[in-house]
Regions:
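Periplasmic c-type cytochrome electron-transfer domains
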Residues: 1-319
Length: 319
C-alpha cells in the first residue's frame, strides 16, 4: 500500500465516493492555492478590496459603487503577466574567493541534507500536461484545469465560468519561447529542468504548538472550524530560486537574515538538516549562505541564467 505524504488536506478529501484529487497546491506558505489565477483573485480581494467578477459575480456585489472591478479578461492579463516573467538565475561574482565559497556552499547545501526537501531541480516533461494533453509540460495553459469551481472561497475559473455565457478555449503559452522576457529555461533532451529548489510538499516545521514557527490558524481547514483554530505547524518547502531578492525570510517572513531562517526556522522534520548545518565550522556556514545569496532574480533581458556581477554570461550553454 502506497503512502501519500506532503499533500495538503483539501487534496486528500474523499467526497461522495469520489477519490481524493491529490492535487499539488504550490502557492501560499501552507500550500492551499492551486494556481496563480486563484492566488491573484484572493490577493486582490484580501489585500486591496478589489473583487473579480469570476469569483464574486457581475455588477457591484460589495455595493461600493464600483461595477466590474476586475473582469475575466483583467484576471487573465494579470495571471499571464506573472507566469511569463523571466525566471531567476544565479550571480557568481568575479572574485575568486567568492566563487570558491559559492561552489563549496552548494556542495555543503546537499551534504547537510538541505537538498532533500529543497530539491535543486524538478522536471517538466514532454508527455505530461494535464491542461493540454497533446502538448509538452512547458506549455502553460490558462485557466488551469485544477482551478477550484465550488465552495464559498473558490472562484469559478474554468473555461466558460458561470458568470459568463461565452465559453473560450484555454490559452496556451510556451514558457521557453524567446519572445518572452529573458532569461528563460530551455528544453534539454526533451525535458525542461526547473531550478526552483523545492519538492512542492508540506512538511512539519515546528516542534509543537508553542513553537514560535507554529501558526494559530490552519488555513487548510474550513474557516471557523475546530481544525482551523487548532493551529498549524506544516508548511510548503520554500522555493529558493530568487531567494536573495525575497527577504525577509521564512514561511512568515519572520527572519531578517538567511542564517536566522536556517537556525531558528527549521524545526520538526527539518531538525536533522539544521543540526547538520550548525555542526559545520563558521566558515563552512558562511559558504552555504554565500551560495544562497547567489540565487537571484536577474534583470529582465539578461541573456543567460548564470552571470557575473556585471551581467556577463558565465555558462555558454545558457546563452
Amino acid at each position: 500500500m502506497a503512502q501519500v505524504q506532503g499533500i495538503p488536506a483539501p487534496s486528500l478529501v474523499t467526497t461522495n465516493g469520489v477519490p481524493p484529487s491529490l492535487i499539488i497546491r504550490p502557492f501560499h506558505q501552507v500550500g492551499n492555492v492551486v494556481s496563480v489565477r486563484q492566488f491573484s483573485n484572493n490577493a486582490f480581494n484580501h489585500h486591496h478590496g478589489i473583487q473579480a467578477e469570476e469569483r464574486f459575480g457581475l455588477g457591484d456585489p460589495d455595493g461600493d459603487g464600483f461595477r466590474s472591478e476586475l473582469t475575466t479578461a483583467d484576471m487573465t492579463a494579470v495571471t499571464l503577466y506573472q507566469v511569463t516573467l523571466n525566471v531567476p538565475g544565479q550571480v557568481i561574482p568575479s572574485d575568486p574567493q567568492v566563487q570558491q565559497a559559492i561552489q563549496a556552499g552548494q556542495q555543503l547545501f546537499t551534504q547537510v541534507g538541505c537538498g532533500s526537501c529543497h530539491i535543486p531541480t524538478l522536471p517538466l516533461t514532454a508527455n505530461n500536461n494535464p491542461g493540454a494533453p497533446s502538448q509538452p509540460g512547458w506549455i502553460y495553459t490558462e485557466p488551469s484545469p485544477y482551478n477550484p469551481t465550488v465552495g464559498p472561497n473558490s472562484p469559478n475559473l474554468t473555461p466558460g465560468p458561470r458568470n459568463y455565457p461565452i465559453t473560450a478555449p484555454a490559452l496556451m503559452v510556451d514558457l521557453t519561447s524567446d519572445s518572452l522576457p529573458r532569461p528563460r529555461l530551455k528544453v534539454r533532451g526533451g525535458v525542461v529542468w526547473v531550478p526552483a529548489y523545492t519538492d512542492l510538499k508540506l512538511h512539519v516545521m515546528a516542534d509543537g504548538p508553542t513553537d514560535p514557527n507554529a501558526e494559530p490558524m490552519d488555513q487548510n481547514q474550513p474557516a471557523g472550524s475546530p481544525g482551523f483554530f487548532a493551529g498549524n505547524q506544516t508548511f510548503i518547502t520554500r522555493k529558493l530560486w530568487g531567494l536573495a531578492n525575497a527577504g525577509p525570510f521564512g514561511h512568515a517572513g519572520k527572519f531578517t537574515t538567511m542564517r536566522d531562517s536556517i537556525n531558528l526556522g527549521h524545526n520538526g522534520e527539518a531538525t536533522a538538516s539544521r543540526l547538520a548545518f550548525q555542526a559545520l565550522t563558521s566558515s563552512q556556514q558562511d559558504e552555504v549562505v554565500e551560495f544562497l545569496k547567489s540565487l537571484q532574480v536577474l534583470p529582465s533581458g539578461t541573456q543567460c541564467l548564470v552571470v557575473n556581477e556585471h551581467g556577463h554570461c558565465l555558462h555558454e550553454a545558457d546563452e
